[in-house]
UniProtKB/Swiss-Prot annotation:
GO terms for molecular function: chorismate synthase activity; FMN binding. This is Chorismate synthase. It catalyses: 5-O-(1-carboxyvinyl)-3-phosphoshikimate = chorismate + phosphate. FMN binds at R125, S126, S127, N238, A239, G278, K293, P294, T295, S296, S297, R319. Its EC number is 4.2.3.5. Transmembrane segments: none annotated. The lineage of its organism: Bacteria, Pseudomonadati, Pseudomonadota, Betaproteobacteria, Burkholderiales. Reduced FMN (FMNH(2)). This reaction introduces a second double bond into the aromatic ring system. It is an enzyme of class 4 (lyase). One of its GO terms (biological process) is aromatic amino acid family biosynthetic process. It comes from Burkholderia orbicola (strain MC0-3). Keywords: Amino-acid biosynthesis, Aromatic amino acid biosynthesis, FAD, Flavoprotein, FMN, Lyase, NADP. Pathway: Metabolic intermediate biosynthesis; chorismate biosynthesis; chorismate from D-erythrose 4-phosphate and phosphoenolpyruvate: step 7/7. NADP(+) binds at R48, R54.
C-alpha cells in the first residue's frame, strides 16, 4: 500500500490499523530547536480521543502518546520524530458477522477488490482510529506555527444534520463535546443525538476551520497551490465528502463585483477567497469548511453482498460514532496545520529572502 505520506518538506507517514497493537506516525522535516514534550501532543489527542461523551463511540482508549525519536532533552533535533499510540480496547469479536460480507458505505468492498485481502476488524487501515496520529503530528505543526509566526489554527462545528450552529464565540468551543461555538444550541444537539442513537442510525456534520496570522506568500503554483493542498488534506480525512475554501460553492451565485475582495491601503475589504489567491496566501484568515458524511457502520439492517456475490443483510454491532463529525474538529485543525507548516518551510527554502517595496496590507480593513 502506498499513499501513506502527506507533505513535501514537512512529511507525516502514518502506520497501523484500528485493532492492531499500535498506531502512530513518523514526522520528517521538523526544524530543530523547538521545545517539545509528550504533554504538548497529549493535550491535542485528548480533544479527539473516544469515549469522552455519550454521543461518541464508547471505545475506551487513553491515546497516550510516546515520543520514540527526534527529541533530545525536550528539544527537537531535526531528525525524524516517531510517535506511538498503543491500542488497548480492541473488541474484534464484534466484527465476526462481516468477515464474509461488506458494510454498505464503508471501505470493505473497495479494499477487498483492490488488495484481495482486508482487515475486517474495525475497518483496519480505513478506520477513523488512524486520525489519532494525524492529530499528534498536527500538535507539532501547530506549536511550530504558533511560536515561529504567531499562526493560530482553530475549528468548530457549524452544523449537525439539519441543525445549523451559528458562530457566537470561540470560548464556547471547548466547553461542550460538540465543539459548538454556540452554547444555546448544545441542548438541541444533545437531544438530536440521543434520538439518533435510539434509532440505530447516523448523521453527518459540517466543520469550519480558521487559520489566523498566516503571512502573505505561502503556496506553490501551479500544481501545489495552497488551497489545492488544503483540499487534498481535508479530503484525506475519513468520511469527508466536500471541501469549501472561502465562499466555496456560494461563489456560483455571487457577482464579480461582490466576490472579488477589494484592496485598500487599510486592508482587504472582504474575504470571499478564504485567504488564498492564485494558490498563494494573502495574509488574511484562511477559512475552510468540510462536509462529513453519516457514519457507515450502523445498527439498522442494510442490504449488501458476500464475497461470493450472494445477497446478504448487514447489521453492525461494534462501538461506533453515530456522527464522526463530533470528534472531527481537532482532526481538521491538524490537517490544516500540517499543510501550512509544509508550505511555510517550502516558502522559506525558495523565497525566504524576497522583499518588495509594496507594504503588506492588513487582512481586514475594518
Amino acid at each position: 500500500m502506498s499513499g501513506n505520506t502527506l507533505g513535501t518538506l514537512f512529511t507525516v507517514t502514518t502506520f497501523g490499523e484500528s485493532h492492531g497493537p499500535a498506531i502512530g506516525c513518523v514526522i520528517d522535516g521538523c526544524p530543530p530547536g523547538m521545545g517539545l514534550t509528550e504533554a504538548d501532543i497529549q493535550i491535542e489527542l485528548d480533544r479527539r480521543k473516544p469515549g469522552t461523551s455519550r454521543h461518541v463511540t464508547q471505545r475506551q482508549e487513553a491515546d497516550e502518546v510516546e515520543i520514540l525519536s527526534g527529541v533530545f532533552e525536550g528539544v527537537t533535533t531535526g531528525t525524524p520524530i516517531a510517535l506511538l499510540i498503543r491500542n488497548t480496547d480492541q473488541r474484534s469479536k464484534d466484527y465476526g458477522n462481516i468477515v464474509e460480507t461488506f458494510r454498505p458505505g464503508h471501505a470493505d468492498y473497495t479494499y477487498w477488490q483492490k488488495y484481495g485481502i482486508r482487515d475486517y476488524r474495525g475497518g483496519g487501515r480505513s478506520s477513523a482510529r488512524l486520525t489519532a496520529p494525524i492529530v499528534g503530528a498536527g500538535a507539532v505543526a501547530k506549536k511550530w506555527l504558533r511560536e515561529r509566526f504567531g499562526v493560530e489554527v482553530r475549528g468548530y462545528m457549524s452544523g449537525l444534520g439539519e441543525i445549523d450552529v451559528p458562530f457566537v464565540d470561540w470560548s464556547y468551543v471547548h466547553e461542550n463535546p460538540f465543539f459548538s461555538p454556540n452554547a444555546a444550541v448544545v441542548p438541541e444537539l444533545e437531544a438530536y443525538m440521543d434520538a439518533l442513537r435510539n434509532d440505530g442510525d447516523s448523521i453527518g456534520a459540517r466543520i469550519d476551520v480558521v487559520a489566523s496570522g498566516v503571512p502573505v506568500g505561502w503556496g506553490e503554483p501551479v500544481f501545489d497551490r495552497l488551497d489545492a493542498d488544503i483540499a487534498k488534506a481535508m479530503m484525506s480525512i475519513n468520511a469527508v465528502k466536500g471541501v469549501e475554501i472561502g465562499a466555496g460553492f456560494d461563489s456560483v451565485a455571487q457577482r464579480g463585483s461582490v466576490h472579488g475582495d477589494e484592496l485598500t491601503p487599510a486592508g482587504f475589504v472582504g474575504n470571499h477567497a478564504g485567504g488564498v489567491l492564485g494558490g498563494i496566501s494573502t495574509g488574511q484568515d484562511i477559512t475552510v469548511s468540510i462536509a462529513i458524511k453519516p457514519t457507515s457502520s450502523i445498527r439498522t439492517p442494510r442490504r449488501s453482498i458476500t464475497k461470493s456475490g450472494d445477497e446478504a443483510t448487514v447489521e453492525t454491532f461494534g462501538r461506533h460514532d453515530p456522527c464522526v463529525g463530533i470528534r472531527a474538529t481537532p482532526i481538521a485543525e491538524s490537517m490544516l496545520a500540517l499543510v501550512l507548516i509544509d508550505h511555510a518551510l517550502r516558502h522559506r527554502a525558495q523565497c525566504g529572502d524576497v522583499e518588495t517595496s509594496t507594504p503588506k496590507i492588513a487582512g481586514s480593513a475594518t
